[in-house]
């Protein structure tokens, strides 16, 4: 049910144990890629779960963008605990990777690299491009999406009408902060939108049905250095 997903979001993003050393000074950023030494091909639109050792519920769930990049920025974590990053395809855990705990506090504050190599068995989603016309220019983004797609909007979450698992929403290939979702969907007119990529998983998982990647007529998209030598997380499953 949809209320279960919304409750899951609240629990995973807001829960911090008073007995832990969790904070948001550190977070995992990474790229899912298919080459063992250099980033030559990112793996797009993977559902990625972050779990902490000893916890039954995942800490957070996200999706890689079209370049294979993902981030758990803002998720409270304890760097002195092991974490696991898992790839979910349909109803199965397709792969898991170990993020080793720190023994001593690092000298830096910020992101911790969590790149991993993953080769999908096959394409797990379909992709459609929506390009607005002149007649759509004055429509608000949310109204346009409701016109083109069978979806509903509840508590800052977009759901396909036929599913209880929502869409992950990107703007210019970057995650949208929760506090900006309402503003972007309900105040931005379609004349500011170049196109929308609609990704639908062939087999929706319990976290997401797919992705909406909104491309504005302005602004830059994030890039990934294709020459960067990558540290890869060890695969444990």
Task: Show the residue positions of the predicted features.
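Short, ordered, surface-exposed loop/turn motifs in non-cytosolic proteins
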Residues: 37-53
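A short, solvent-exposed loop/turn motif at the edges and junctions
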Residues: 54-57, 78-108
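Short, acidic Ser/Thr/Gly-rich low-complexity loop/linker segments typical of extracellular
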Residues: 55-69
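Short, surface-exposed beta-strand/beta-hairpin micro-motifs centered on an aromatic residue
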Residues: 65-76, 183-184
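Extracellular beta-sheet/turn segments enriched in Thr/Pro/Gly and aliphatic residues
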Residues: 100-132, 212-218
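N-terminal periplasmic accessory domains that precede
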Residues: 131, 143, 207-236
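Extracytoplasmic beta-strand/coil segments of soluble accessory domains associated
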Residues: 135-174, 204-215
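Periplasmic plug
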Residues: 155-199, 225-236
